[in-house]
């Protein structure tokens, strides 16, 4: 596997910004003051989930690994204990980065060449089958911050192949009436559901849009678009290539933002308390999540 080439040009990084061994990246922008401001945004008592439901598929044969060949994001083996059963248990096999799973990417997920954030050699971060730097350990305390929702195509969807720029984000921000500030989570809607069945070119974030997020000091990104699925494999994945290894910005892939869009329209506001509390699993490259927007 080779890492796709980054576009030419001066791309800023956060390497060294919070120390040579930092593992939190842009989550460092979430200060106590940011959390307090976020909690103050929860005034109506409404809770909206940003996760797609996943139905497990019974495991009945060899396990195909990778994002594409797996029959589902979750495979399940049920265990009936006794007859009559005193308890029913199961084992779940999670294909974390499956396109059908709402999940968060750890910073180690995509390296820049032979380094991961913030300049740690890949051979040091991942060795002997274990991830020791840049893993999901950074999410053990959860993510609590203010979220801002930007709808790039209210009531519609972006055109196929649209390349999202900072100007698109500026215009969506003006419509929302809520400014993205340091430490905020950015949630974006383009009106698409990425899947392996899609034959059209999915809209995608450009480098300009990612640099917009860096300039605003976004702590975490969640959107129904991000990178266009690379065809052929090895093609550019600008958002993942810049956000994860260079900026140290965690990405939430595959969220369901439809109910959030409807709620923002109903309440006439686009900011909320944003909470993500993944399992406290260390040493993984990502985890399934159920992000919550609390109004």
List the model feature ranges, each with a label.
Residues 1-295:
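Active-/binding-site microenvironments in catalytic and ligand-binding cores
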């Amino acid at each position: 596997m080779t890492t796709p080439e980054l576009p030419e040009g001066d791309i800023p990084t956060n390497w060294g910004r919070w120390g040579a061994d930092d593992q939190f990246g842009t989550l460092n922008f979430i200060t106590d003051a940011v959390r307090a401001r976020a909690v103050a945004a929860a005034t109506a008592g409404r809770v909206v989930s940003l996760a797609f439901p996943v139905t497990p598929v019974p495991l009945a044969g060899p396990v195909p690994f990778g994002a594409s060949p797996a029959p589902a994001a979750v495979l399940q083996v049920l265990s009936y204990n006794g007859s009559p059963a005193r308890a029913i248990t199961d084992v779940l096999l999670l294909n974390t980065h499956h396109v059908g799973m709402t999940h968060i990417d750890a910073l180690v997920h995509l390296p820049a060449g032979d380094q991961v954030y913030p300049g740690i050699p890949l051979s040091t971060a991942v060795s002997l089958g274990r991830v020791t730097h840049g893993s999901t350990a950074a999410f053990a305390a959860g993510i609590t911050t203010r979220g801002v929702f930007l709808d790039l195509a209210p009531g519609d969807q972006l055109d196929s192949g649209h390349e999202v720029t900072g100007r698109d984000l500026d215009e969506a921000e003006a419509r929302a009436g809520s400014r993205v500030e340091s430490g905020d989570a950015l949630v974006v809607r383009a009106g698409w559901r990425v899947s392996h069945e899609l034959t059209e070119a999915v809209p995608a974030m450009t480098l300009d849009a990612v640099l917009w997020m860096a300039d605003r000091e976004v702590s975490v990104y969640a959107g129904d678009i991000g990178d266009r699925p690379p065809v052929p494999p090895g093609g550019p994945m600008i958002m993942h290539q810049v956000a994860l290894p260079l900026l140290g910005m965690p990405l939430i892939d595959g969220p369901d933002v439809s109910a959030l869009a409807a709620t923002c329209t109903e309440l006439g506001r686009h900011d909320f308390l944003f909470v993500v509390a993944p399992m406290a699993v260390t040493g993984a490259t990502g985890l399934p999540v159920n992000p919550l927007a609390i109004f």
